[in-house]
Amino acid sequence: MVILAGNNNFLDGQTVKTKNIYNELVRKYGEENISKIDTFNWKKHPIYFIRKCRKELRNTENLIILPAHNGVKVFVPFFNFWNKFYHKKIFYAVVGGWLPELLASKVWLTKEIRKLSKVFVETTKMKEDLSKLAIKNVEILVNFKSIPILNEKDLKYEYSRPLELCTFSRVMKEKGIEDAIDVVEKINEETNEIVYTLDIYGPIDKSYVDRFEKLKNTLPSYIKYAGCVDSEKSVEVLKKYYLLLFPTKFKTEGIPGTIIDALSAGVPVVASKWENYADILVNEENSFLFNMNDLKEFENILKNLKDINKVIEIKNKTLQSITKFKSETAMQVLYKNIEK
């Protein structure tokens, strides 16, 4: 079996999901039966890379690819072409919810996607949207994290002010980082009290580095950048927090790993309603939801949640809602197709 994956130490969702799938395949089938094609910096040695891809496709029965926005335009047609000679199973595991929107304007790529053995998407809506494009070879492989789920007896129920909030995603404007900062500042200033603190975790998007450096210099003491956390340590870090904030502006998010992290740690989420939110979040069950870009609604939710009892009431439901996103459950659909 071969998996096409970048061999790097990035902490973005694409890299984390790729590593999670690779690690679960190794656990299931043994490292000696899994070969990895490293896509990191492949353009520096294109001839070597192309030869390796051909060789690996020829020598395997199952190829799993996880290309993102740019890679899908290259790797799907490339492997489809060579597969005319080798007739192997090619599976595409999509990271995020963006693929239907991309394909809607690219008929040629839609035709290529139809040729794949199976396309695994993260959400129900993605499957429905691809079906409208006459792509029928689709199944749902929910995003998952190979992390422990907090034991219910270890849930935190005692809180005092200031209440600790955090974000745990890529640091960029489109993830709503500035909205989170603005809302927390406004609530604290209006009450003339530090009701909330905010810790910002995650890799800083390269397009946002300069802006964020300037922004950090203006932040009050109760808001700080807390750096990056290894994926496997997320539950341990997050479990102390009152709420995780996810005010994303990306409407095509899939099942964000940060949401899985928070719920696995027993931490309810305050999130904007992206297209696929309903596949993982239920308002006032494991989360508190507001319409995307509605800062007033976001602010009102946090004002309302100064009442600690409203959060404590749903703490145990966060753990109950995460079961289907456990690795051993999520991967069954991929194993089934590999072993056909």
Language-model features, listed with the residues they occupy:
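A short, histidine- and acid-enriched strand-loop-helix "catalytic/donor-clamping" loop
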Residues: 68-72, 88-105, 118
